[in-house]
Amino acid sequence: MTTLTLNTSLLSSRRILAAFSGGLDSTVLLHQLVLWRERHPDVTLRAIHIHHGLSPHADSWVRHCETVCERWQVPLVVERVTLADNGLGIEAHAREARYRAFAQTLLPGEVLATAQHLDDQCETFLLALKRGSGPAGLSAMGERSPFAGTLLLRPLLRETRKTLEQWAVRHGLCWIEDESNQDDAYDRNFLRLRALPLLQQRWPHFPAAVARSATLCAEQERLLDELLASDLTDCITTEGTLRLSPLMSMSDVRRAAILRRWLAMRNAPMPSRDALERIWQEVALARDDASPCLRFGDREIRRYQSQLWWIKSVAGQHETTVAWPVWQTPLALPAGLGTVQLVPGGELRRPREEESVSIRFKAPGLLHIVGRHGGRKLKKIWQEQGIPPWRRDTTPLLFYGETLIAAAGVFVTREGAAEDKEGVSLVWHA
């Protein structure tokens, strides 16, 4: 293996963050990147090691990675992640935590490089085949993928594991062996340790053939993307919701393709055929007076005003009151709802000295809002403003004392309106 493949993959990238576990694959990747940096002095290279805490050897792996990076003069970031049982399984949860840490560590203009190779590609394809995936899932991994507002590069994807090992031995590289890689209770390990050796013994070029099939599936997906682009434009609103009316006249196959692409745009996991059918039957086609909801982990699909919404699951906060004693500073909201802030310039009056400030999520009685005649209950205002039901007890309401002043981004009450130019605005960073 030469540096040619790597150079081609990274031709336009000058700031690189390399995922570095210390194992064979990532050690070869980092070594290749160090050689690339030597040939291109304008390249900035960093490495990141994820400490999952799953192995008793995890601390020694950190020390190994620190030693390697110090020798190669590569700045190393070590991120420790905590894995809790979220129903995904340990492999999927570890991967999720790992890539979340990658995304948080990337600097502006930096790309992420990972060490997946041809054998990994074959395993990914077979796992997708086992799940009954369609062309999107069978496309497996690309050499370049969008990630966290930048790119995820897989420069070694055309190389075999055997080739990487030959390179490492030839150059005297040292790497760690994760004992969990020998546990064939994990699906990927089962394929690598037991299934693929048999397949390659019979058909030596099996991984390369699988990679070609994955490439063909990816090409079919790109063609479908082109053919369905106009449909997607018609169906997706500026808020990112999916309009149902255009879908009603589509064939089942076309509609399913649109649903998959919409969910992909919302960064949702790829749904199974059964999941798509449930979305359509239980949510899209629910009774007009229903408020259908389908849970997917910590996310939900809901329907409102003939549109599908992909949202984060948040418990209602109607009984919650959050005191805001120092209203000049931002206030953190409960349940991951973000922060609120009162900033100078706006149509809200400032609180009087004797008024306490708080955020609540319900308001009793009739409310008089700026720009409307007469009083209305909060429920009626939500309906008039087109606020979806699940946002009605999670939208921050600003109170001075017992007086409702404003709902973030929705309305201002007459009691809260500024009478001079010294007003403030309620800004909600959800």
Swiss-Prot record:
InterPro entries: Lysidine-tRNA-synth_C, Rossmann-like_a/b/a_fold, TilS/TtcA_N, tRNA_Ile_lys_synt, tRNA_Ile_lys_synt_N, tRNA_Ile_lys_synt_subst-bd. One of its GO terms (molecular function) is tRNA(Ile)-lysidine synthase activity. GO terms for cellular component: cytoplasm. It is found in: Cytoplasm. Keywords: ATP-binding, Cytoplasm, Ligase, Nucleotide-binding, tRNA processing. ATP binds at S21, G22, G23, L24, D25, S26. It comes from the Bacteria. CDD domains: TilS_N. Signal peptide: none annotated. Its EC number is 6.3.4.19. Pfam families: ATP_bind_3 (PF01171), TilS (PF09179), TilS_C (PF11734). GO terms for biological process: tRNA modification. The keyword ATP-binding applies. Ligates lysine onto the cytidine present at position 34 of the AUA codon-specific tRNA(Ile) that contains the anticodon CAU, in an ATP-dependent manner. Cytidine is converted to lysidine, thus changing the amino acid specificity of the tRNA from methionine to isoleucine. HAMAP family: tRNA_Ile_lys_synt. Belongs to the tRNA(Ile)-lysidine synthase family. This is tRNA(Ile)-lysidine synthase. The lineage of its organism: Bacteria, Pseudomonadati, Pseudomonadota, Gammaproteobacteria, Enterobacterales.
